[in-house]
């Protein structure tokens, strides 16, 4: 039997396999190049970018939890100018699509970032992090209010011809309503879930462990929530969905595809095993071989309910 076809396509971006790296867990790609063959994964999604460099939150900002981790890094990044000057040259050398995750404090900032990224040939597409407060409108998080999400996505859509993926926050009452708002604003694809908001407490000091008090929960603990949300959203929209949340193995990744995801992102697993994304892609291929499946696309949305 010839090797199964693991290739998928997201909004015109051709991936050799469905495994992408999740933003914030893989640096800008170069940091992991010594541990992972970057040409054995589907795409690299870079650490979230902002217009200006960002120092992030004070420490402590990471805490291990049962079945996962809490992070309050605070979107620390080099800023768009340093990204173009120092990070893009490496991406030019890699034969794997690079998708740039970015965020802003206002609709205008999102649009400006999209406009600048649009001009960089090495950027195959963009992933918008809408889990940020809108500083012009009382700090409401863009990703928790459909109209706010629509306005950001629409502004980005008008600023670029490159594929636009929107990363959805799970900290909402109705994830489908948010998905519809982004699809209506002409997003090309949706990725979900971002982290769930959580906290950890030190009983001895009676204080929060994280300096920021709350942080984002990720890892295996969130996988059942992520699977459910991916399943709901994939049924509700016509654009591709990318599954994120606690993916540690090829089995986990394939479950997300059955739920309706076209591709997946590996995040927290990268901290435990720097080669996780490559290993997960290999495990997916082995499953297809073992089960006589010739094309991974046969599994997308094949959940029998």
Curated annotation (Swiss-Prot):
CDD domains: DHOD_1B_like. One of its GO terms (biological process) is 'de novo' UMP biosynthetic process. InterPro entries: Aldolase_TIM (IPR013785), DHO_dehydrogenase (IPR050074), DHOD_1B (IPR033888), Dihydroorotate_DH_1 (IPR024920), Dihydroorotate_DH_1_2 (IPR012135), Dihydroorotate_DH_cat (IPR005720), Dihydroorotate_DH_CS (IPR001295), Dihydroorotate_DH_I (IPR049622). Keywords: Cytoplasm, Flavoprotein, FMN, NAD, Oxidoreductase, Pyrimidine biosynthesis. Substrate binds at residues 47, 71-75, 129, 194-195. Its cofactor is FMN. Gene3D superfamilies: Aldolase class I (3.20.20.70). The active site is at residue 132. FMN binds at residues 23, 47-48, 101, 129, 167, 193, 219, 245-246, 267-268. It is found in: Cytoplasm. Pathway: Pyrimidine metabolism; UMP biosynthesis via de novo pathway; orotate from (S)-dihydroorotate (NAD(+) route): step 1/1. Transmembrane segments: none annotated. Belongs to the dihydroorotate dehydrogenase family. Type 1 subfamily. Catalyzes the conversion of dihydroorotate to orotate with NAD(+) as electron acceptor. Heterotetramer of 2 PyrK and 2 PyrD type B subunits. NCBIfam families: PRK07259.1, pyrD_sub1_fam. This is Dihydroorotate dehydrogenase B (NAD(+)), catalytic subunit. The gene is pyrD.
